[in-house]
Amino acid sequence: MKIEDCTVEENVQIAKDTYKMKIKGNFVKECRTPGQFVNIRIGDGREHVLRRPISISEIDRGENLVTIIYRIVGEGTKFMANIKKGNEIDVMGPLGRGYDVLSLTKEQTALLVGGGIGVPPLYELAKQFNKRGIKTIIILGFNSKDEVFYEDEFKKFGETYVSTIDGSVGTKGFVTDVIKKLQAENNLVFDKYYSCGPVPMLKALVNAVGEDGYISLENRMACGIGACYACVCKKKKKDDYTRVCYDGPVYLASDVEIE
């Protein structure tokens, strides 16, 4: 983990309130597993004391670049949306533990399920699975058509399905409605699933397909390094808690309570 002044190589809007930023820095050499995140300081850190945790969407170690995708939800991310190409930002990272890309072998099948701003970390995962010859089935959930992003990018790596709550594109409803449809058609055969999204989506996913998979939690975070215990969640098999920013954010679905 490093704290580094990095250069913004790109910062563009890709969907409603959603932006893609490319960051260049030496910390990228330490990025290894899909699902890790960075903590970005907002301005000089005086007006906005807490950094903003943003998942890493793509890793390019050859060019020392990472791509992050974020949504404007408050003053911090609004500030980020106004950062220009060539500006410097203070980045702490990489942080957390990501998905186990070695949990499947060649010719096995992975089911990737993302909801909203939980979609981005699955892109690097799909890319790495593709390189290893692992088939991927990808399901992406959004509220509406104007919030959809990266559908075409994911299609490069596997069968890709989109759901929207209002039915403006893809299957009307939730990611689990796509799953039910594929199950009814006997078109959903996979060895393990990998997911990231809001708590209701993760709960519904586990109810639909069981616990043999990975979930990435989106708990609110403060320090990002496990020191403040602001982002803990409860373990299933013992009366204990785990720090999402340090021990996660990716867990086996069978290991933690989804609350």
From Swiss-Prot:
GO MF term list: 2 iron, 2 sulfur cluster binding; electron transfer activity; flavin adenine dinucleotide binding; metal ion binding; oxidoreductase activity
Limits of the FAD-binding FR-type domain: 1-101
Binding site for FAD: 52-55, 69-71, 76-77
Cofactor(s) needed for function: [2Fe-2S] cluster; FAD
Any GO BP: 'de novo' UMP biosynthetic process
UniProt remark on cofactor binding: Binds 1 [2Fe-2S] cluster per subunit.
InterPro entries: Cyt_c3_hydrogenase_gsu, Dihydroorotate_DH_ele_sf, Dihydroorotate_DH_Fe-S-bd, Dihydroorotate_DHASE_ETsu, FAD-bd_FR_type, FNR_nucleotide-bd, OxRdtase_FAD/NAD-bd, PyrK_electron_transfer
Pathway of action: Pyrimidine metabolism; UMP biosynthesis via de novo pathway; orotate from (S)-dihydroorotate (NAD(+) route): step 1/1
Stated family: Belongs to the PyrK family.
NCBIfam families: PRK00054.1-4 (NF000799)
Entry function: Responsible for channeling the electrons from the oxidation of dihydroorotate from the FMN redox center in the PyrD type B subunit to the ultimate electron acceptor NAD(+).
PANTHER family xref list: DIHYDROOROTATE DEHYDROGENASE B (NAD(+)), ELECTRON TRANSFER SUBUNIT, DIHYDROOROTATE DEHYDROGENASE B (NAD(+)), ELECTRON TRANSFER SUBUNIT-RELATED
Subunit comment: Heterotetramer of 2 PyrK and 2 PyrD type B subunits.
Entry protein name: Dihydroorotate dehydrogenase B (NAD(+)), electron transfer subunit
Classification lineage: Bacteria, Fusobacteriati, Fusobacteriota, Fusobacteriia, Fusobacteriales
